[in-house]
Amino acid sequence: EMVGLPPRVYDMYPHELSGGMMQRVSIALSLMHHPKLLILDEATTALDVITQRQILDELMELERQLQVTRIMITHDIATVAYACHKVAVMYAGQIVEFGDVADVLREPQHPYTQALMRTIPAQPRETAIVRGIPGSIPDLSEPIRGCAFADRCSLARNICRNEEPPQITMPGGSQVQCHLAGGVKHAG
């Protein structure tokens, strides 16, 4: 009942459930042992927008009611903007930027976060031109020297390719792992 499922769902088979119902069942199962931490990996992927919003609303309410901490792993920036307080932006397995969602999305400091924000279409999806980030991710089977994003970054300097970037705390409290943080804006 906490996740919005009628009792009849208990007797149903997985193939009889919609995508949203299956997500709710998964969430209900994960809450059975009263966890303090709930990790949700792409919890709203492949759901229609209305069902996504319902699931997110339910998750936020469960977080409040049960006092459970929620970590969401997602590539959907709209989900982050709607349902999260903090965001950690990762590239090649490293957190490159961390902070309050509003601050990071409004004024991203890391060149990867800035490039990621530019990939979001400003127009309706039917007419939007999707802009990707040029280049390829690094080979993660080998140790990365310097910044993992350097080969794709238009602002990269020699230091970026040769030295691991420092973690810098910005005036607003966000943390950025970049040699250029705060001093240079990524050209759009």
Across the structure, where does each feature detected by a protein language model lie?
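ABC-type ATPase nucleotide-binding domains, specifically the catalytic core motifs of the NBD
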Residues: 1-5, 16, 99
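Short catalytic/signature loops enriched in Gly
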Residues: 98-188
